[in-house]
Amino acid sequence: MIPRRHHFKPAPQPTVQVLQPPDEDAPSLTITMLGAGQEVGRSCCVIEHRGKKIVCDAGLHPAQPGIGALPFIDELDWSTVDAMLITHFHVDHAAALPYIMEKTNFKDGNGKVYMTHATKAIYGLTMMDTVRLNDQNPDTSGRLYDEADVQSSWQSTIAVDYHQDIVIAGGLRFTPYHAGHVLGASMFLIEIAGLKILYTGDYSREEDRHLVMAEIPPVKPDVMICESTFGVHTLPDRKEKEEQFTTLVANIVRRGGRCLMPIPSFGNGQELALLLDEYWNDHPELQNIPVYFASSLFQRGMRVYKTYVHTMNANIRSRFARRDNPFDFRFVKWLKDPQKLRENKGPCVIMSSPQFMSFGLSRDLLEEWAPDSKNGVIVTGYSIEGTMARTLLSEPDHIESLKGGNVPRRLTVKEISFGAHVDYAQNSKFIQEIGAQHVVLVHGEASQMGRLRAALRDTYAAKGQEINIHTPKNCEPLTLTFRQERMVKAIGSLAATRPEHGTSVKGLLVSKDFSYTLLSPADLHDFTGLSTSTIIQKQGVAISVDWAVVRWYLEGMYGEVEEGVEEEGKAAFIIMNGVQVVQISPTAVELRWKSSSSNDMIADSALALLLGIDGSPATAKLTASPNKHACNHSNSHSHTDLYPHTYPGDKSAKDVASNPEFERLRMFLEAHFGHVEGPNLRPPLPPGADGDGNDDKDKDGDDWLTMDVKLDNQTARIDLISMRVESESAELQKRVETVLEMALTTVKSLSQTFLGGGLDVDMVKVEPNESDS
């Protein structure tokens, strides 16, 4: 440590230095739809923020064959995905998962796939069923994966619980919430570096016979990515739908017809089975007419439904508690052999997959029953554009047969949606309750989505509110920018006492996963497991000039240099309170400093300055005159001191008042205000004397230097020690303070600017003379 030759009082060091974040840390969010952008089907949403990448859902388009059914997977480097979140098991949300996990470079990265326990259980069954159905399709190009791919993807997925907070390294976390819709369906509240995104998937805000409705997360998200399946349509309430449905079914079988209901193996099929079983129980006249579900997958899935009763609504849970299993149907039976239908020509009700009737048993039964007007088909779910289910709704005279040719269509076609999607009223209310700053509409046809956006804007405008609604197309990135505050949490000994407002708190700033913690260096190991080390750096430089010349250059660059001796007695300078320049020999100096971002910059600049001394014209001028040269020998002779060493006690009042920094400050103020007086210095009052108007003293009686700015008969006095401004005119005081701030930035030396101090002023005590007595 170098002994100081005089007292130097530096300004307080900055407590925390916060660097600008890199580009990838910019507070913007990018949402790219690889599917379900202004369409229904192949849901796949990519969310990117602060270097993190999340994919929500990976479905197939039911109306497209083969590769064309996949999302636009070539638009993404799947090895960079941090997590995939699957909302539910439906084909248009999960059926592309085996292909992505097994046939892309997703497996080369570190990403994991997450879904709820019930979704994972049913996912394995439905994907195996998808493989089986694809194998039945004569078009082999539709076979995207096999059973081995499905099994491998199923084993790699991670099952999570509702309301479970899942934390992934790097500031990424998510929580699943109930979405209604189907068993196991969830919406995900995703948080990336403090930014919250709610991805709803398909959801329902109406409790049915076995499912709870979608819940509102307790935390308000910044962005809501929301389905828009039904657009502005308003659906009848549940009781009305159930009455219409059961009446339609009863009318078909009472006229001797056969009723076909194409359903997914899981989802509204179980809901309809509960409804029909209850209706048949209440109508004995129908109990001789069989009701079938023609799906082995449906039968196997009932075991899953019984396993996850705890996720269903209170009615189902209470019935199970009474040992009354609602899924033990009395009248709805499993049709193991479809040939039985061809042998028995009487009326019946059959629920069969697949839902969209593109192929499979539901398509076979449609073609077989279509010519008979006594028969009927009831479409109970949402029909995607391009599927046979959507074609039937237009009631064509003929339908295309998979065997070739056309089949006359005489059976009745009705639609009653039990698809467990929200209608406009439910969707609009839910969006308002969530209260997100941005709403992104997905999973809806372009026309429906456009009408929904207009209706939502009108709803908010009527309340005098604004909302940002976006409807991105597939592969068109949507970028949203957010203004986020960075909060620093003090822990350990720093948090022992609450600091007063305006006080400085100094400590180590620890950043992890986009969160910031301030703690004392002594607490670092206890709270983080990290240890600290101090790096002392040294750099030798050869010089050929006198030690005084070195000081002259350092003073010219940094404004103030402290002179002293280091521990071994060698002469040294201290630059800006951080870097030592030690004279290790007459022809060499050594820079020494504790490594830090600020000290490294100072050392770099000092090194560049010292290396340029020999080639500088100023050096030649300084050493050209006799006795003003570098002395590299031991002969004793006089030298002209390039820097007159003056200390506080050596400076007279006249010396201080004529400080060139004050002169530059006065010139700066005169350019703005015109009339400036000073610097002024008056001796203190003698003991016992009365006041004479001289108030330029501190509490110890030492004189203060002042400067007076006069404008329009008003005066503002500047204390040149503290740089405070006082005036009876508040307006003039404010103007002078503003100009003074600019002036100090201009006239201060580099060291004063860096350390945050004022002008270099030493306190001067002036003895009173007789004229002042």
UniProtKB/Swiss-Prot annotation:
Residues reported to bind Zn(2+) 2: 92-93, 202, 443
Biased composition (Polar residues): 624-637
Organism superkingdom: Eukaryota
Enzyme class: hydrolase
Annotated GO MF terms: 5'-3' RNA exonuclease activity; metal ion binding; RNA binding; RNA endonuclease activity
SUPFAM superfamilies xref list: Metallo-hydrolase/oxidoreductase
UniProt-annotated location(s): Nucleus
Family from the record: Belongs to the metallo-beta-lactamase superfamily. RNA-metabolizing metallo-beta-lactamase-like family. CPSF2/YSH1 subfamily.
Protein name per its UniProtKB record: Endoribonuclease YSH1
Organism of origin: Cryptococcus neoformans var. neoformans serotype D (strain JEC21 / ATCC MYA-565)
